Amino acid sequence: MVGQTEIPARPLEPALYLVATPIGNLADITLRALETLAAADIVACEDTRVSRVLLDRYGIRRRTTAYHEHNAGEAGPKLIAALQGGQSVALISDAGTPLVSDPGYRLVGEAIDHGIRVVPIPGPSAPLAALTASGLPSDAFLFAGFLPVKVGQRLTRLEALKAVPATLIFFESPRRLAESLGAMVEALGGERKAAIGRELTKTFEEMRTGTLRALADHYAAADTPKGEIVVCVGPAEAKADEPADIDRLLLSLAAEMPASKAASEAAKMTGGQKQALYRRLLELKDTSGEGDGG
């Protein structure tokens, strides 16, 4: 029941339903999600105790079972068998969208392999909530989950992500936040723009923005923060092409087309000015003794 409205428990087709749940504020759930949870034969939960709070809040009484990283090998086949037997299964995580930093992808893969329909029921997502409030570029982003605990492995992972032309999104624990931010400064550079989302959608929600170095300094000096944390790091700035690289590009293009068109194409590819590139190409051709090719 939502307010005075009874949630209809309409029969569901046999399928695996991936139901997004609130990341903090229990009001952040869709009507479709509630209808699905109210009608599913089985609700598979990361932690049944955590999920019971949500289900009780909306008066949903359905059979629940645990499905998490430590029992996936045993619980997965049982859920597949239930699906093959004509039952509907709703998969939920403790918070947010299933499969985002949890083992649900294994169950989805098994369902697909067995020809079972998989239905996404979209809704809350902590990485997307943080990204949209960060002020960082959102046209391209990469969710990297939790960084490794060991220092060496953490730096190796960050080095691998250094040149990715997208906003990076991480989950982090409060006790490791300061250390991880320090590693990001070392591996990614301290001047990158970043944002820290903490306790998103909850009473003490906080979004703190600044450079990586400023944020690292802040959390190194502050008490250990509380709550769930999402770290967003802006993409690396595109480096200007080296003059030698531009020269090689101009000569390569000029070998296939007139100089004016080569300069025009080079301008499109590098963001440079066509006239300046044209003059540079003529200089290169004069030096090589080729003269003006038009």
UniProtKB/Swiss-Prot annotation:
Q: Which reaction does it catalyse?
A: cytidine(1402) in 16S rRNA + S-adenosyl-L-methionine = 2'-O-methylcytidine(1402) in 16S rRNA + S-adenosyl-L-homocysteine + H(+)
As for subcellular location, the record says: Cytoplasm
Q: What is its main location?
A: cytoplasm
What are the EC numbers? 2.1.1.198
Which principal EC class is assigned to this enzyme? transferase
Q: Which UniProt keywords apply?
A: Cytoplasm, Methyltransferase, rRNA processing, S-adenosyl-L-methionine, Transferase
Q: Name one Pfam family in it.
A: TP_methylase
Origin, by domain of life? Answer: Bacteria
Q: Name one GO molecular function term.
A: rRNA (cytosine-2'-O-)-methyltransferase activity
**Gene Ontology CC annotations of this record:** cytoplasm
Q: What does this protein do?
A: Catalyzes the 2'-O-methylation of the ribose of cytidine 1402 (C1402) in 16S rRNA.
Stated family: Belongs to the methyltransferase superfamily. RsmI family.
The protein in question is named Ribosomal RNA small subunit methyltransferase I
Q: Which organism is it from?
A: Mesorhizobium japonicum (strain LMG 29417 / CECT 9101 / MAFF 303099) (Mesorhizobium loti (strain MAFF 303099))
**Lineage of source species:** Bacteria, Pseudomonadati, Pseudomonadota, Alphaproteobacteria, Hyphomicrobiales
